[in-house]
């Protein structure tokens, strides 16, 4: 018996939110043969639910490691604090950066997010395809109801330039700051998440919970953000 960890965007599904029939068949076959299949993703719970997968999974790691669910039961959750969220929001507003909160109940976007994220969403979904016309949206998007929250798994902000990311690293000493944006190491967005949290951390925690040796683990990913998934299994 093995336990499989699958990244979502770019691995299980493509950047247009489509799941190949081969991927679906592989997941079903793996579970039929007695293996565990878990998602290991930066997505929060509502994003995963909005995918409407028509096959079963054993659970998932969300928020790049700050949320773990097994067979519908939450076994770990460490969101950002209210103070951290306020710091992030005020910083983004001071720099006129569009931002969002990724919570288990949905993705709450700033009022200017849809307008300022058009190019980032186009590049994320279509790369350099000049024939693409409409920027895709996310069914998990919600109107922001509060600028400050205590249930945020991680944040994201649209990069006007790479300097925004570098400045964020200096600004948020009590959070993990990263970038993401599709294939490889393309940086379209910056993000912040709780300190001490990573996909590696969560995989180790889940393996301990299930009493499974790391030698029985297999991880699948497509970008540099998935490299931490490999650390517990090598």
Residue ranges and their predicted role:
Residues 4-6, 60-61, 219:
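Residue-level marker for buried hydrophobic side chains located in beta-strands
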Residues 2, 35, 97, 210, ...:
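Short coil/turn segments at beta-strand junctions that form active-site/ligand-binding loops
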Residues 2-17, 39, 88, 230:
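Asp-based phosphoryl-transfer active-site loop
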Residues 2, 58, 234:
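Conserved acidic residues
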Residues 106-220, 224-232:
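Conserved acidic, metal-coordinating active-site core of Asp-based
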Residues 10, 65, 221-223:
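Active-site metal-binding loops of divalent metal-dependent hydrolases
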Residues 12, 69-72, 186-189:
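A short acidic, helix-capping loop that chelates divalent metal ions and anchors anionic groups
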Residues 18-124:
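Active-site phosphate-binding/coordination module
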């Amino acid at each position: 018996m093995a336990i499989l960890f699958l990244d979502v965007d770019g691995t299980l599904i493509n950047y247009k939110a489509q799941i190949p029939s081969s991927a679906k068949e592989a997941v079903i076959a793996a579970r039929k043969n007695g293996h565990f299949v878990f998602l290991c993703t930066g997505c929060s719970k509502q994003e995963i639910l909005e995918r409407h997968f028509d096959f079963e999974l054993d659970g998932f790691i969300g928020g790049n490691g700050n949320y773990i669910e097994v067979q519908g039961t939450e076994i770990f959750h460490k969101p950002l604090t209210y103070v951290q969220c306020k710091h992030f929001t005020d910083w983004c507003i001071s720099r006129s950066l569009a931002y969002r909160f990724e919570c288990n109940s949905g993705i709450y976007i700033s009022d200017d997010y849809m307008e300022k994220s058009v190019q980032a969403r186009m590049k994320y979904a279509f790369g350099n395809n000049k024939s693409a016309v409409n920027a895709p949206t996310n069914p998990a998007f919600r109107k922001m109801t509060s600028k400050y929250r205590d249930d945020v798994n991680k944040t994201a902000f649209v990069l006007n330039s790479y300097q925004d990311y570098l400045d964020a690293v200096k600004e948020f000493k009590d959070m993990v700051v990263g970038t993401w944006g599709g294939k490889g190491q393309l940086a379209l967005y910056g993000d912040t998440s709780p300190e001490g949290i990573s996909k590696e951390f969560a995989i180790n925690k889940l393996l301990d919970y299930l009493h499974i040796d790391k030698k029985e683990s297999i991880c699948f990913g497509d970008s540099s953000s998935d490299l931490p998934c490999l650390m517990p299994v090598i």
